[in-house]
């Protein structure tokens, strides 16, 4: 969010996305509901947007929030505005709902698994002594992004990535890729992560370089 809060307000009658002016109408284009864009010229315009949706004078008796996404500061501000409302943590309930996928979501995840395989296949082609982690990772990422664009030509493309570590760099599960050159006998860690419309799939494998 780059320091600017984003939110989704759901009432019994409507769903509204709240997004920062820096992203203009992109959040509206990629959502199925209404959108309020706020500027940050004045402090707490995000909160004013929430008030404009649910009202301050006759607020709901209870307000559900995701505590695992809410900072202490934002939680205090919300409670100071809606003093007569009871706040309930619904993060686990929503997580359970997110685990139930539609057929369209399942199709995206299956395509993600297929594309992750293609990325790994491309990486294996480029593994050789003297090649760098960075260049190998770029090859895998580019293959996946092109396949995502082929499969979903009207999507937006962002956050598809590859972790590829070698030798001592494999000691941590989330180590960044480096410009280290592969050496014969290296242990290799291959991770491909295609991101399709916010859904990411992971393929992770351990390999060894024996020239």
Which residues does each PLM region occupy?
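Active-site neighborhoods and metal-handling regions in enzymes and metal-associated proteins
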Residues: 1-211
């Amino acid at each position: 969010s780059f320091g600017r809060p984003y939110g989704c307000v759901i009432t019994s009658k409507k769903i509204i996305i709240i997004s920062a002016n820096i992203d203009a109408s992109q959040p509206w284009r990629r959502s199925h509901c209404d959108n309020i864009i706020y500027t940050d010229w004045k402090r707490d315009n995000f909160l004013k947007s929430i008030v404009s949706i649910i009202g301050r004078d006759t607020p709901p008796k209870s307000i559900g929030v995701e505590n695992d996404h809410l900072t202490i500061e934002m939680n205090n501000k919300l409670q100071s505005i809606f003093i007569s409302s009871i706040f309930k943590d619904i993060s686990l309930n929503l997580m359970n709902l997110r685990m139930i996928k539609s057929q369209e979501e399942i199709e995206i995840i299956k395509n993600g698994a297929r594309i992750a395989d293609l990325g790994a296949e491309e990486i294996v082609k480029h593994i050789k002594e003297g090649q760098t982690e960075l260049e190998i990772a770029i090859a895998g990422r580019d293959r996946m992004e092109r396949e995502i664009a082929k499969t979903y030509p009207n999507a937006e493309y962002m956050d598809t990535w590859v972790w590829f570590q070698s030798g001592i760099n494999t000691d941590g599960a989330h180590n960044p890729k480096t410009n280290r050159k592969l050496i014969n006998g290296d242990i290799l860690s291959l991770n491909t992560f295609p991101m399709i419309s916010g859904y990411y799939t992971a393929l992770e494998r351990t390999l060894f370089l024996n020239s």
